[in-house]
Amino acid sequence: MAGKLVSLVPPLLLAAVGLAGLLLLCVPTQDVREPPALKYGIVLDAGSSHTSMFVYKWPADKENDTGIVGQHSSCDVRGGGISSYANDPSRAGQSLVECLEQALRDVPKDRYASTPLYLGATAGMRLLNLTSPEATAKVLEAVTQTLTRYPFDFRGARILSGQDEGVFGWVTANYLLENFIKYGWVGRWIRPRKGTLGAMDLGGASTQITFETTSPSEDPDNEVHLRLYGQHYRVYTHSFLCYGRDQVLQRLLASALQIHRFHPCWPKGYSTQVLLREVYQSPCTMGQRPQTFNSSATVSLSGTSNAALCRDLVSGLFNISSCPFSQCSFNGVFQPPVAGNFIAFSAFYYTVDFLKTVMGLPVGTLKQLEDATETTCNQTWAELQARVPGQQTRLPDYCAVAMFIHQLLSRGYRFDERSFRGVVFEKKAADTAVGWALGYMLNLTNLIPADLPGLRKGTHFSSWVALLLLFTVLILAALVLLLRQVRSAKSPGAL
């Protein structure tokens, strides 16, 4: 009798496994797609000095995930920024054609219609809008006409506010560095514990500082609330118009003409003819404009390599004596104390990189940055040219910009030696340029969800069919074995 029971165990086990498998296969599942094709997005960063085009890419089925958008290609538009075409708006649109033609080559043809195309203009156009709203509208109209002629999904050309520029730069940096969320080795999304880092951007006409803060801002205009992946962020941000690299240089030039009749920040042995109209045509130098002057006149100006006088000239850009709040950065703007790590990009990066690679000077501390700036400012024109043969365009201005950066960080934003150790100067993160453009596109295309992505598990249809057949075969095999056991038990020779 015991032998009969033992002989029934194998077919019963097979039947149990088969039935369990069939029951599991009947549980509702999610469809799992095959490896997806790529989607693309294009952003034109219309800055004050030039326009850059960025083409981004991501898996087509990851519209609401993260850690997957990267830079596919980029293109620098020849010529100045679109605001420089205020007197001939049609040229603003024409200037974009070469890079847009590259976009046609970089994006697969079958993806043209689904590729969003954005143009965002920053401080250069904000300045133009202050002096000539009519010219601003015509420039935007001209670039819109050009962009709509291309087969992409054009979604508008607009002027970003300073707050937008700061916040989107902060989003870009933290997104690329996976500070919001990352895909862990266990196969699911996790929230890193390292926290976010602040972002500092130095453009041509404005500079922005943005960082997460725990306390409410005393000035509501400087506070932004974001909800990303189920996490709330209170962010401080401020944009200083007229404190971008190019506008700072214009303001220093106007001050040098007014105070010295020579330029202490320029290297000794360098001189040039300065057209007064170009110095005073910007809204940023309007307060320094003489009551009467010949706009078509030119003035010869020479450099003196005087670091001390250059420092005094730059210091005049910052008003740190007046503050209507409990604490300020400069010009009466509220700012909480800087804390945590920061990434500084754009002209911050290029200037500090010059000090490190061309001048061969350390810049790891505020004191080293100050010393490197002073060393650069004391160089003659011949000494600078010997270091970078053939480079003429930006070489005379590295002293002034480096001096401005040191003053901005130490006197303006109130970094000390301890907090400065958390500042890194970078051009890219995860092989993607750091700036507002990616954050802008992520926001407008809803590629960053407000809540944490859900975890889905599914089975490919072909695998599901194979398992169904396997478990069916197991059940049939079990039935065959049971029938054989029963017949064997009923046979005359069975015990």
Swiss-Prot record:
This is Ectonucleoside triphosphate diphosphohydrolase 2. One of its GO terms (cellular component) is basement membrane. It comes from the Eukaryota. Disulfide bonds join C75-C99, C242-C284, C265-C310, C323-C328, C377-C399. Glycans are attached at N64, N129, N294, N319, N378, N443. The lineage of its organism: Eukaryota, Metazoa, Chordata, Craniata, Vertebrata. Residues 26-462 are extracellular. GO terms for molecular function: ATP binding; nucleoside diphosphate phosphatase activity; ribonucleoside triphosphate phosphatase activity.
